[in-house]
Amino acid sequence: MTLPVQDALIKVGGSRWEAALHRNGQVEHLRLLSDDGWVDVDFRKGAYAGFAWHGEWNGEKHVIGVTLDERDTDGAIFTGSSGALNFSLRYHSVDGQFAVTAAVANTGKIPVQPLSLGLMTGIDTYMEKFPDWNDKFFPTLLRCERTHFWGYCMRPEGALIGIASPQPIASWSLQYNVGYMEGELEWGGHRVETFTLDFLHAGPLPERHPQRLSELLPGETKEWTILLLPFKRPDQLLTSLAPVCAAPMLELERTTLAKGECTCMTIHSCESVAARVLLPDGRRMTVQPEAAGEGKYELLIQAGESQGHIRIEVENGSGKQSEAIVSVRPHWLWFLDKARTAALICPPRATSHCESWYGLYTLYSSQQYFPDREMLEQTEQIMSSIYPLMFDMETHEPLLVKHRIQNVSSMVGVLVDRYEATGDEAALQRASDLADWLISHAQYPDGSYRAGKTHYTSVIYPAKSLMELILAEKALAECNAVWRERLIRHTASVRRAMDELVAADGDIDTEGELTYEDGMISCSSLQLGLFALMQPEDERGPYREAALKLLNGHECLANLLIPDGRQRGATRRFWESQYDVAIQPNMLNSPHAWTSWRTYGTWYAYLLTGQVYYLEQTMNALASCVQMVDMSSGALRWAFVPDPYVRARQINEQMVVSDWSRAQEGHHHTLKYPSQEFVIGEQYIGMISDWHEANLQDNDVHEHFKCLAEVSLGKAYVAQDETGRLRTWNCSAEEKNGILHVSPTEPKVELVHLNLGVKKVCVHFESGEISADLRETVWVRKDGRIIRDLFIGQ
């Protein structure tokens, strides 16, 4: 069908791009040529279409219309105006790549100081259903530097689009959807409509952002060029964007260091560079990175005695600046100790949401590392007071919101930790009974665990909780027929659930609004990974491959390139603040507690494959997450918010519970209560359950410390990566006379994982030396035992 003249699409393009444009300047479709062929980029229609000028000033939001002004075979220019502001939008090629150049001029007599003014990109980031979401580009990273901008969008199937501007951009924002309405009140949804690049924006903005892009003076014109470049792999991004931005791009393998450790930062730059370093103790220094090849420099970053953050600002000869943050941490046990203290300050409570009593994980697991009779008694008193309010003591049935089967499975996990902390077999018996209730009431014939008809196998990992129970039951089952029968029953249930996950191949549901959901994907991967590790080598294949496929797709939701030790490895979650800490509207919570679900997944992936890439991700993410404990004050925070500017409201008057004999239910919409408005931007958010009594879920932060206990406490790692380099975590390694000497650098290390191939090794535990003649990847215990598979014990 031929379109009417007024709606006919404008076809433009260059050697590496093709676009179809509407006459209002918005993109109907865009194709970019990558090394692997053409990549289709979908664009939104309606209110979120783009590219389009959007702004907010004088208390009103504005969408500025533009119309076609001129065109040629390579591009088109659109122009429009609003009051004294004249706007233009040009599509064209820069070095063969797709580019959008936007300009605005103030023809008036007074300054224009908008709250925001920029381009809504219109790129379709709306991940609604399977399998469509596999072809949507999620805005994985958007980063303003003082002199330029860069970032990328990524699909679950692996394609990337780099986004770069050689000009400074004040800010950015994601357009979050509305999930559902409660009368006239909006609850934030689980999808991102698209995103906006705010060329001008009012403060306050994060210190790294340009600070003087808040106004347009009379007679002034400003112009920005945005380039979109397709990539096959993330490791191509920084090298390629450096010349586009004409700025240094900073690459860090390790974003957190223990005291005394060092890391090498690679700087991609077409010009020579200098670096200014601000140390945690306040000292400043200027250093000269060393040339390491064409367009590449290296800077060695050494952690001193002071814990906190090292800020590195790199500047090239043209004055372009980029910033990195490397965290310097105390030992891992310090974080667990502080989290335990916080779990009694913000105590677990009986509610309809297991997130409210997640602190029990930390309280019980820390008892194994810091035995303390008084704190254990307090923990047991909490458990004794809240458990009967949530579960029937005889039937083990949940007493409220029975469809939230994650409440049941999470309590199974807590009771396993209680058993391991106290040796009380009654705790494991109760966990076993709860598991039986879950299996009989929530497992469907296809093997999945469900809440009603909704697939719940991957909502707070119920199968992993059962696997934790199974691992605890194994020792008892060796000499007890009753426990053996329970072990067999629970193992069979988990196998059915994992077989169903393999068969589903990503076509699964989640709690709340369906999307390519951070936790749904990471929990699927981690459960499949752990189950694979519990199988003999020749039976792992289907579970391992399914776990890795999901985990690799999940990279589009993970912060794997950001040079920031506060955020590295964090997953891009954005609807939890409204439930956990009574803050609205939506904003990224990254890291949030559920980031640690990916950390389990990458750890299991490393143990399954030996690929150091996964171990590096694991340790970087773990270190970012445990920094929810403030390394200066020791206080526990809830999450980190990377959004640069969010006008938010939070409940500011204490919500009091009148009847402590009942478990609390439901959520609390911010606007139903007295609240206060303030601006949030690239910062930590504190916990609030120390002064609010109502059902809030900020205790979910304790997932980080549950993960810490499983992945890193009492463990050290030595591995040889694909380049032949020796990599260590929680230990040092030095070769002398043909023997690799490994010395733990963390307290209470009892296991060392050696991924070295054929090698003679001597491990220097606190209790003595253990020598081993390695032929394969193994764990070495401090008692001298060599273990090939940690979750099988062989």
Give the residues covered by each predicted segment.
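Trp/Gly-enriched beta-strand surface patches
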Residues: 134-215, 272-274, 281-287, 760-763, ...
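Catalytic cores of extracellular degradative/oxidative enzymes
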Residues: 329-596, 603, 607, 612-625, ...
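Extended acidic/polar, glycine-enriched regions
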Residues: 274-334
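Short Pro-Gly-centered flexible turn/kink motifs
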Residues: 214-232, 788-790
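Short, hydrophobic/aromatic beta-strand segments
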Residues: 108-118, 237-238, 274-277, 751-754
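Beta-strand-rich N-terminal accessory domains
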Residues: 1-101, 105-180, 185, 225, ...
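Terminal, non-catalytic domain-edge segments
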Residues: 234-263, 271-272, 307, 472-485, ...
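Low-complexity, Pro/Ser/Thr- and charge-rich linker/hinge segments at domain boundaries
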Residues: 127-131, 238-260, 322-352
